[in-house]
Amino acid sequence: CKINPNGREWFDIDDRVNGPEQAEPVIMEMISSLLAAHGLNENALVLVGFSQGGMMCLHCGLRMHPPPAAIVSFSGALLLQEELSALSKLPYPPVQLIHGTDDKVVPYVLMEEAVGVLQPMGVIVDTVERPGLGHGIDPDGLSASMNFLAMHLQK
C-alpha cells in the first residue's frame, strides 16, 4: 500500500479508473462464495468498508443484482461516477456515507459529490458528517452505522 506500508489496498490508489474494475470481479466472486458457503442470499448481506474498502463497497454493491441489504462507507468515495449513473439498474440498496470534515486523505467534499450522483439515481442516502474527524472512524460514526444496519436488516 503506497500510503501506509502496513496497510492493505484493493487497487493502486493512483489508478482510480482501471483499479476498481480489476478488483470488482475478485470481490464479487468472494461475496458469492461466502454467501453460498453460509447458505445466505443478498438480503442478509451488508457491505461495510473504510477508505478504499468503502469505495469498493459502493462500487460493487451498487452494481449487484439482487442488491445487498445495505452499504456503509466510512471515509470513502464514489468512483467511476459517469459509468454508474449511466446504469439503469434498480433497485439500489440504501447507502450510508460517514465522513470526517477534516479528512485530508479522502476529502469530505467527495461525500457531498457522491450524494449528488446517488440521490438522482433513486438511491436512498443517509449521510453522517463527523465534525473535526480526519481519515478515520470514531465511536459516534460507528454507532450511527450500527443503527443504520439494524434498521435495514430488520426488513
Describe the residue ranges of each PLM region.
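Serine-hydrolase catalytic machinery in alpha/beta-hydrolase-like enzymes
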Residues: 1-44
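Short beta-strand immediately N-terminal to the catalytic nucleophile in serine-hydrolase-like folds
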Residues: 47-49, 74, 98
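A conserved short beta-strand
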Residues: 66-79
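Gly/Ala-rich beta-loop-alpha elbow adjacent to hydrolase catalytic centers
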Residues: 48-53, 57
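Short beta-strand/loop motif that positions the catalytic acidic residue
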Residues: 96-99, 103
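C-terminal catalytic histidine-bearing segment of alpha/beta-hydrolase fold enzymes
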Residues: 109-155
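Hydrolases whose catalytic domains are alpha/beta-hydrolase-1, hotdog thioesterase
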Residues: 56-60, 82
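Flexible "cap/lid" loop of the alpha/beta hydrolase fold
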Residues: 5-14, 76-95
